């Protein structure tokens, strides 16, 4: 009885018990097999990965690991086989197979290329990664900033067929969506980009304003070309083999109808106006209709507006839609700010934790006195925080425009808040303060003297303080021209008679850093003679320099060091550069250097990457070592309060003892990298603005960097260069220099003597010597 009841209880668990027993038995049996075949090297390898091993085999493995010696298989390339270079893509995006979202193709013609097509380019080009214009005109001249593709045949079907073929061949692997439109269409670019971002790319989609064919069925629809249409990449890939057949079989006077029939006949795909909950909305603009007075929902929500008869109408439509987008953005900001205010009450800090402006980060909180952000004081004409350390300098350029914009915004906000009861007019700026907060943006505090006018015409002067904030916007990647490190660099070394003794050391460093590693660089020596030097019967002061250059040419066959002789009473850097510029092509990359500079491969590569033709000039800031007499190799610590020791030169070798300190010399601008074409353009602009005697006087007070800064529209990139380390030397400050250049030269010499600790110690030792 008990046995039957026990079996009844165990009957549900019998399969589990039998399965566990069978599994354990098979596992034990497998372990015995593995232990019996321990001599098999394959089994030993399996045991190393985690299988059980016996002690003897493990001991043998440990012993073999100690005696293991790797066998190095050398690689020998067969000289009979052609060498195949590994092709690396220019961008990692290409290697990963990533694609851009949207490409826009605009169909234009000979009559509208310079009018409507230009208007389209100015209104939507900055919203899309690529915008192409296709025309049947042969040899069409492209307006500035536009990429035009000419097919040479203006027949509608031919133009559409060649456009699709071009898109497939050149951009089929780079974009997910292709939007085709006419040049008489205005497109709301942000909405179109958002639409493409919401659609799935793994589908055959033909999206636009669906129209019926004449005499065709209800299912056969094409997308009207006047309102534009989207083609998916997969559909374009499927359509490509059928283009030639459609061009011969389908006759149509309109390119959009031809494309619609080709898609239906070859692939069975028709146009749709709605897909995945996204509807393509368009608006047909009536003739002589004013966009400012149009307020229908169809117009306000449209992706495309057609037809646009002239360029001015295109700009008016763009103004109208931009204002609508701006109002919508302001409305969303106000709603978000209201939600933040409501939620802030529920936080532990309460309303005290609400920052101004609402929704932006709180001001930066300094943790020590070294992190306190200072305010810069300014007026409408001057600023009292200058880059060169001067106490006062004129407010000009971008800073003046920034202050003017802040004043206009302050007055506009005051009038918007108090109108129509009060109206304010600015009389003058009493005080202005601004600072840059890295957590928020640029902050302004303005003390304004205002004239207040009431509705009854009463006037009164008021002084009010206004606080403004220009917040940091979204970080954007600016497109830059592509540059490489394969560009040849032409070094230019102006040499005065006083610098001739240091030239052989420069040439030896040039040979070791440039000629030995076979850098793609050349050197031109510009020998500057004085009015009474190097004449007939007089010794040549540059004889040693010429001999050293000839010796380098002998040591390095194929190397040619060119030199030019110039006679000048007061050598100007710009005049010397004029001489060199005429001897080289316009695409030459110049590296203007000094006899104390030691350029190396890294410096030359940064010169190649930072100097961009037609875009940017690069003027590095070199590291100047201090006077060894004041900054010995192992200088003792300075007196209390003298400040920290000066920094060591970049790249110093600590094994050679404590290096001499130094600083980055911001006052010097003798080194520079720029293209000859950019220099010639800036020089021509200087000659056009300054003529005659005024130009001659200006050249005496200008350096090459000043020419680019004042007479060129290029970006001027000025940054520290750790690879340019110069030994201490006192610059020859000629009294013929302009007042500004002479001041900069003297300041560079004084600041280059030593750091605060070294100068304080030198004064202390001098006082001790005088007292004894």
UniProtKB/Swiss-Prot annotation:
Q: Which organism is it from?
A: Homo sapiens (Human)
Q: Which residues are glycosylated?
A: 121, 342
Signal in keyword set: no
Query: Which GO cellular component terms, listed alphabetically, does the Swiss-Prot or TrEMBL entry include?
Result: Golgi cisterna membrane; Golgi membrane; membrane
Tissue expression profile of the protein: Ubiquitous. Highly expressed in placenta, small intestine and pancreas.
Which of the residues are on side Lumenal?
30-772
Q: What is the protein's given name?
A: Chondroitin sulfate glucuronyltransferase
Q: Where in the cell is it found?
A: Golgi apparatus, Golgi stack membrane
User: Predominant location of this chain?
Assistant: Golgi
Q: Where is this region: Disordered?
A: 629-662
**In Gene Ontology terms, what is one molecular function of this protein?**
N-acetylgalactosaminyl-proteoglycan 3-beta-glucuronosyltransferase activity
Per the record, the domain of life is Eukaryota
Which membrane topology term applies here?
Single-pass type II membrane protein
Family statement: Belongs to the chondroitin N-acetylgalactosaminyltransferase family.
Q: What is its EC number?
A: 2.4.1.226
């Amino acid at each position: 009885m008990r046995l039957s009841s026990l079996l009844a209880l165990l009957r549900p668990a019998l399969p589990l018990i039998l399965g566990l027993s069978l599994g354990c038995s098979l596992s034990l049996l497998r372990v015995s097999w593995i232990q019996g075949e321990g001599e098999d090297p394959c089994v030993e390898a399996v045991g190393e990965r985690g299988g059980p091993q016996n002690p003897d085999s493990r001991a043998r493995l440990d012993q073999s690991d100690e005696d293991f010696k790797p066998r190095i298989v050398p690689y020998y390339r067969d000289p009979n086989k052609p060498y195949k270079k590994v092709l690396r893509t220019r961008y990692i995006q290409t290697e990963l197979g990533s694609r851009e979202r949207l490409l826009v193709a605009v169909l234009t013609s000979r009559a509208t290329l310079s009018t409507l097509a230009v208007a389209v380019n100015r209104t939507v080009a900055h919203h899309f990664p690529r915008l192409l214009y296709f025309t049947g005109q042969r040899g069409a001249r492209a307006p500035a900033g536009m990429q035009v593709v000419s097919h040479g045949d203006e027949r509608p079907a031919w133009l559409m067929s060649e456009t699709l073929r071009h898109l497939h061949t050149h951009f089929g692997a780079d974009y997910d969506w292709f939007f085709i439109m006419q040049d008489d269409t205005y497109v709301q670019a942000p909405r179109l980009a958002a639409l493409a971002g919401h659609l799935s790319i793994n589908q055959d989609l033909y999206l636009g304003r669906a129209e019926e064919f004449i005499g065709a069925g209800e299912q056969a629809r094409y997308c009207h070309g006047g309102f534009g249409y989207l083609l998916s990449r997969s559909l374009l890939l499927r359509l490509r083999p059928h283009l030639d057949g459609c061009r011969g079989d389908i006759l149509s006077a309109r390119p959009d109808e031809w494309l619609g029939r080709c898609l239906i006949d070859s692939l069975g795909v028709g146009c749709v106006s709605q897909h995945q909950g996204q509807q393509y909305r368009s608006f047909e603009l009536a003739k002589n209709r004013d966009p400012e007075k149009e307020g229908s929902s169809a117009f306000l929500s449209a992706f495309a507006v057609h037809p646009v008869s002239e360029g001015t109408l295109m700009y008016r439509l763009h103004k109208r839609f931009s204002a609508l987008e701006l109002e919508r953005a302001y409305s969303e900001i106000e709603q978000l700010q209201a939600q933040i205010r409501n939620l802030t009450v529920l936080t532990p800090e309460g309303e005290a934790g609400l920052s101004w402006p609402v929704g932006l980060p709180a001001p930066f909180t300094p943790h020590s006195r070294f992190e306190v952000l200072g305010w810069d004081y300014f007026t409408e004409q001057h600023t009292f925080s200058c880059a060169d350390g001067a106490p006062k300098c004129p407010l000009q350029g971008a800073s003046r425009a920034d202050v003017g914009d802040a004043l206009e915004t302050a007055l506009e906000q005051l009038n918007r808040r108090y109108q129509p009861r009060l109206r304010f007019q600015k009389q003058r700026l009493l005080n202005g303060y601004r600072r840059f907060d890295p957590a928020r943006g640029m902050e302004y505090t303005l003390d304004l003297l205002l004239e207040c006018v009431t509705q009854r015409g009463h006037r009164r002067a008021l002084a009010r303080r206004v606080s403004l904030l220009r917040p940091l916007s979204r970080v954007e990647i600016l497109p830059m021209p592509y540059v490489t490190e394969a560009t040849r660099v032409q070094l230019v070394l102006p040499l005065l008679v006083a610098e001739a003794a240091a030239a052989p050391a420069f040439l030896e460093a040039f040979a070791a850093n440039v000629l030995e590693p076979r850098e793609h660089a050349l050197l031109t020596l510009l020998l500057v003679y004085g009015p009474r030097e190097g004449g007939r019967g007089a010794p040549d002061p540059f004889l040693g320099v010429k001999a050293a250059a000839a010796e380098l040419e002998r040591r390095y066959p194929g190397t040619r060091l060119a030199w030019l002789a110039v006679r000048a009473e007061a050598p100007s850097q710009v005049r010397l550069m004029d001489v060199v510029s005429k001897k080289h092509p316009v695409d030459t990359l110049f590296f203007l250097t000094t006899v104390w500079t030691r350029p190396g491969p890294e410096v030359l590569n940064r010169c190649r990457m930072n100097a961009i033709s037609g875009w940017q000039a690069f003027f590095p800031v070199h590291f100047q070592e201090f006077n060894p007499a004041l900054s010995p190799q192992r200088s003792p610590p300075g007196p209390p309060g003298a400040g920290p020791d000066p920094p060591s030169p970049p790249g110093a070798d600590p094994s050679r003892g404590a290096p001499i300190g130094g600083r980055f010399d911001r006052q010097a601008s003798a080194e520079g990298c720029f293209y000859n074409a950019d220099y010639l353009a800036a020089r021509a602009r200087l000659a056009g603005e300054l003529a005659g005697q005024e130009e001659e006087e200006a050249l005496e007070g200008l350096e090459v960097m000043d020419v680019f800064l004042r007479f060129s529209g290029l970006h001027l990139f000025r940054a520290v260069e750790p690879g340019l380390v110069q030994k201490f030397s006192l610059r020859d400050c000629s009294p013929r220099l302009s007042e500004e250049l002479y001041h900069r030269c003297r300041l560079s010499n004084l600041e280059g003597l030593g750091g605060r600790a070294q100068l304080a110690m030198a004064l202390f030792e001098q006082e001790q010597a005088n007292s004894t």
